[in-house]
Amino acid sequence: MKAEITINSEGGVHGKSNFSLTGWQYDMYLSLDGLSNKEASEALKSRFSELNYETANINNFKNNRNDALLSFDFDYQAKNYSKKIGQDLLFRAIPFNELTSINNIEERKLPFENAFAYADDYEIIYNIPAGYKISEMPQSQSISSAYGNYSLKAITNDKNQIIIKRQITINRGSYPKEQFADYLAFRKKNCQCRQF
């Protein structure tokens, strides 16, 4: 996913995101195919419910069945994305929570499986409001395990922008029930890395 998001001084955002989905994610989003733009927009608002949307629209929806590739643009405005504390704005690095439901019962009776491997790259450009300076940036983070890899880094430029680059790879595999707590900890760490 590539996105450009403008944060306003009241904490709202206007974003333009371009999604290009293959593999497991193609299957997860395939239900959008055949819906009207309004229905698909409502479905995405429901999927990405952590944003307080004022408007949301899907455009340029394409399903390339031969290559199993879905692509679409998602334009939105949302309130209360960031919090103002003094002269600082705090916000999530990744606006959309891609983590699907995971059974978080750590005591399992059966082995578990990641049936579909996938890799996902996000590049998000945040335009910071005029009058704000980027005073502090989080440390780059990287997590590696038998279940996959996760990295998140933030860089700034001279245009008062923050550029977030996030990569996640989930490995295909079957694992004994005793490793589920470790897998769950890996996925939870991925989520914790998203707040700036």
Please report, for each region that a protein language model flagged, where it lies by residue.
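A sensor for short, sequence-defined functional sites
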Residues: 1-196
